[in-house]
């Protein structure tokens, strides 16, 4: 860089042209100089670009129909629940993006978030729906078990530990965590014992509901980075839950009876109409749930008010379970076929065998969650034998294998080779 005059005190910044006397600091490089003001400006530009790249663009937010189509690739059935979730999630992140970009009208109308309550029996896809949504939107996702939570000051997990799981899922990026999704499972287990307020302390029921209120609504929470109360001198992490979407799920066993008592289906006395058990399913009953039913079940009014979107997932029948085995992109049958492919073996299921697996899952009452356990039992012996059998080319699973514990048929390579040659000869003829 050229000097001004003979003195060495008038060096110029190569970017802004200011002299050494006009700035606080001038840093020299090989033939160039940069001042402290230009360094600060460069840092501001870099921070702005990084912040913009980390945000979801307004035009990139998927529409509700696109969200439903994505869910269809991974979750079988549950059309009503998918529609409700898609609309709620779209409105939630649309609100966040509108506030981020300063969309017209946001100054006059403040948009509140709508948390979601999912009702339905175990193994019907509540957790899977929430996980798939988070994966599609590329936002941090955390699952919490409500049964482990207790009121502050008692043995158990604090509600702030839920937020710690979300922060960990975001790799401690607080800004990302503040737009994440938290799924609180088994939320029906924190219902109080009766609909009337109790004079005794309910530390794992109503006390947990009270502790969750501010978090669901939106507050700046202090989260212990090491969890729990074992490290009293640790510095807390602050996270704003205003834009965190909470999805609460539970089986709510017994809620159907409360709804039926309100709607008048069934009844008692000499003039009451006797109703067959199969006439009205739990799924149909859950679709008519009202806030007053949740209150009678044991949720406090403040907690119900912070979960405005209530939807239910339906029980899975035999055909739905068979579809779950084969249709989704990560279907169980495809997963096991891939495992056998790694050993150079083809795995084939007959349709009656898949139906038998679905029947077993329905008998156990475990829903889709029990399918993997049944598949492991069915394939255990063949998964033990095949890796040590170099002649194995194909494994056939029949209905008898599932129901009668018969060993699967292992077809040798020589037989499959002869069959392939025969098929080629028949085609050429």
Curated annotation (Swiss-Prot):
What name has this protein been given in UniProt?
ATP-dependent Clp protease ATP-binding subunit ClpX
* Record carries keyword ATP-binding: yes
One MF term in GO for this entry? zinc ion binding
Gene (UniProt): clpX
Q: Which residues form a coiled coil?
A: none
Which PANTHER family does this chain map to? ATP-DEPENDENT CLP PROTEASE ATP-BINDING SUBUNIT CLPX-LIKE, MITOCHONDRIAL (PTHR48102:SF7), ATP-DEPENDENT CLP PROTEASE ATP-BINDING SUBUNIT CLPX-LIKE, MITOCHONDRIAL-RELATED (PTHR48102)
The UniProt entry's GO biological process terms, in alphabetical order, are: cell division; proteolysis involved in protein catabolic process
Q: What keywords appear on the UniProt entry?
A: ATP-binding, Chaperone, Metal-binding, Nucleotide-binding, Zinc
Q: Show where the ClpX-type ZB domain sits.
A: 1-54
Q: Which GO terms describe its cellular component?
A: HslUV protease complex
Species source reads: Salinispora arenicola (strain CNS-205)
Record's function text: ATP-dependent specificity component of the Clp protease. It directs the protease to specific substrates. Can perform chaperone functions in the absence of ClpP.
Cysteines paired by S-S bonds: none
Q: Which SMART domains match?
A: AAA, ClpB_D2-small, zf-C4_ClpX
The family classification in the record reads:
Belongs to the ClpX chaperone family.
In this chain, Zn(2+) is annotated as bound at: 13, 16, 35, 38
Per UniProt, subunit arrangement is:
Component of the ClpX-ClpP complex. Forms a hexameric ring that, in the presence of ATP, binds to fourteen ClpP subunits assembled into a disk-like structure with a central cavity, resembling the structure of eukaryotic proteasomes.
């Amino acid at each position: 860089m050229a000097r001004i005059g003979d003195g060495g005190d008038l060096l110029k910044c190569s970017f802004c042209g200011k002299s050494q006397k006009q700035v606080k600091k001038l840093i020299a490089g090989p033939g160039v100089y940069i001042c402290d003001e230009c360094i600060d400006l460069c840092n501001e530009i870099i921070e702005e670009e990084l912040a913009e790249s980390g945000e979801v663009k307004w035009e990139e937010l998927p529409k509700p129909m696109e969200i439903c189509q994505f869910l269809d690739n991974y979750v079988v059935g549950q059309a009503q629940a998918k529609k409700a979730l898609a609309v709620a999630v779209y409105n939630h992140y649309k609100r966040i993006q509108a506030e981020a970009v300063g969309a017209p009208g946001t100054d006059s109308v403040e948009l509140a978030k709508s948390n979601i309550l999912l009702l339905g029996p175990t193994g019907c896809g509540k957790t899977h729906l929430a996980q798939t949504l988070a994966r599609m939107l590329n936002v941090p996702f955390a699952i919490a078990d409500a049964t482990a939570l207790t009121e502050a000051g008692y043995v158990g997990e604090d509600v702030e530990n839920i937020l710690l799981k979300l922060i960990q899922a975001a790799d401690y990026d607080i800004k990302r965590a503040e737009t994440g999704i938290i799924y609180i499972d088994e939320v029906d287990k924190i219902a109080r014992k009766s609909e009337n307020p109790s004079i005794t302390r309910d530390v794992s029921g109503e006390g947990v509901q009270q502790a969750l209120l501010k978090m669901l609504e939106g507050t700046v929470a202090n989260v212990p980075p090491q969890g729990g109360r074992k490290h009293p001198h640790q510095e807390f992490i602050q996270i704003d839950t205003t834009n965190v979407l909470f999805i609460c799920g539970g089986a709510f066993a017994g809620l159907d009876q409360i709804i039926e008592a309100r709607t008048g289906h069934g009844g008692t006395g000499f003039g009451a109409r006797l109703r067959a058990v199969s006439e009205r399913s739990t799924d149909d009953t859950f679709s008519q749930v009202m806030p007053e039913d949740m209150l009678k079940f044991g949720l406090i009014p403040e907690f119900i008010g912070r979960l405005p979107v209530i939807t239910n997932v339906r029980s899975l029948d035999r055909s739905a379970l068979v579809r779950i085995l084969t249709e989704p992109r990560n279907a169980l049958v495809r997963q096991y076929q891939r495992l056998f492919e790694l050993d150079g073996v083809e795995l084939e299921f007959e349709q009656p065998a898949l139906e038998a697996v679905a029947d077993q899952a329905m008998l156990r009452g475990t829903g889709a969650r029990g399918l993997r356990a049944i598949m492991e039992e069915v394939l255990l012996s063949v998964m033990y034998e095949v890796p040590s059998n170099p002649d194995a080319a194909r494994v056939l699973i029949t209905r008898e294998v599932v129901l009668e514990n018969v060993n699967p048929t292992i077809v040798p390579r020589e037989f499959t080779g002869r069959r392939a040659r025969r098929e080629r000869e028949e085609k050429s003829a």
